[in-house]
From Swiss-Prot:
A zinc finger (CCCH-type) spans 90-217. It is found in: Host nucleus inner membrane. It comes from Gallid herpesvirus 2 (strain Chicken/Md5/ATCC VR-987) (GaHV-2). Phosphorylated at serine residues in the N-terminus. This phosphorylation regulates the localization within the inner nuclear membrane. This is Nuclear egress protein 1. The gene is NEC1. Belongs to the herpesviridae NEC1 protein family. One of its GO terms (cellular component) is membrane.
Length: 300
């Protein structure tokens, strides 16, 4: 192989002293008191890799001794499918870059503490979904988006079309589940937009969760809850203009398991929604958001 120089690995039998020294050096450097001595992170890493080069069989033993991971963040590109994140990954998006972090070692996760997540098992989500008719005002931001979507339609049949849209969106419990988990976590000023997902079917809607501000950090526990709540749905992190968002759309090649979710009477929800006095500023903000996202192409 041209251009490569292969270095022969040293024999363990010929140089056991190096192994012993590396082992002792590695363990000494992981003592709490070592942080104030002249050792540096580079010294620690060098001792570690010298040791495993001589005794790879002991690598697992040393990995178990690790307190802090060697790699704390991983750079990603958008759009990013959250199914590629592992259970302990948090998400950070800002003008400085897009990263997955290790939740237990993320300064933002540690400083903010665990999100105030209540019960988010499937039974609790189904109960909230069924009882939404009794909490219309609590979910007004979710429902206001449907009102604006209906208002964008033209013609005398607009009210009938809005009721039809509401019926179709309400019939997709996973969209409500995703919003409920975010609302339950305490994240404020989140908006949701609904668009037809032609690839998933003529009556299937997808949802964009649009976050406020110029930076976004999602705790790893929140991400885990959302993924668990939206099985058979893709959760994709993206950015459009200056807005960070999550796209919730069905995996159209997979069947959803919603047979355990009771149907919600959309007509009753619509009647209560018509009697609800929703803030005009909220409706205006939604109108601007829909106009801004009309040209957005959702990732496949």
């Amino acid at each position: 192989m041209t251009g490569h120089t292969l270095v022969r690995r040293k024999s363990i039998g010929r140089d056991k002293r190096l192994v012993g020294r590396s082992r002792r050096q590695w363990r000494d450097m992981n003592l709490p008191s070592y942080g104030n001595s002249k050792g540096t992170n580079m010294d620690i890493y060098r001792a570690y890799f010298e040791f495993i080069a001589e005794s790879p069989a002991d690598e697992l033993m040393l990995v178990k001794d690790l307190v802090t991971p060697l790699i704390k963040t991983t750079s990603i590109s958008l759009p990013f499918d959250m199914s590629e994140a592992v259970a302990d990954n948090c998400l950070s998006l800002s003008g400085m870059g897009y990263y997955l972090g290790v939740g237990g070692c993320c300064p933002t996760c540690v400083s903010s503490g665990d999100p105030r997540l209540g019960r988010n098992d499937r039974a609790a989500l189904i109960l909230a979904y069924v009882q939404q008719i009794n909490n219309i005002y609590h979910y007004r931001i979710f429902l206001a988006s449907i009102i604006v979507l209906g208002d964008r339609l033209r013609g005398d049949a607009r009210d009938k079309d809005m009721e039809s849209i509401l019926t179709r969106i309400i019939a997709i419990p996973e969209l409500f589940f995703a919003y409920y988990v975010l609302l339950d976590s305490g994240i404020k000023n989140v908006k949701v937009l609904f668009y037809l997902d032609r690839e998933a079917g003529s009556s299937e809607y997808m949802m964009y969760i649009v976050f406020p501000g110029k930076a976004l950090h999602l705790h790893y526990r929140l991400i885990d809850c959302m993924k668990s709540a939206c099985k058979s749905y893709r959760i994709i992190a993206h950015v459009w203009r200056t807005n960070f968002l999550l796209v919730i759309r069905k995996e159209y090649d997979r069947q959803t398991d919603s047979c355990d979710v009771p149907a919600v009477n959309a007509e009753d929800v619509y009647c209560k929604l018509c009697d609800l006095n929703i803030d005009g500023e909220l409706l205006l903000e939604y109108g601007k958001l829909y106009s801004a996202f009309d040209e957005f192409l959702p990732p496949r």
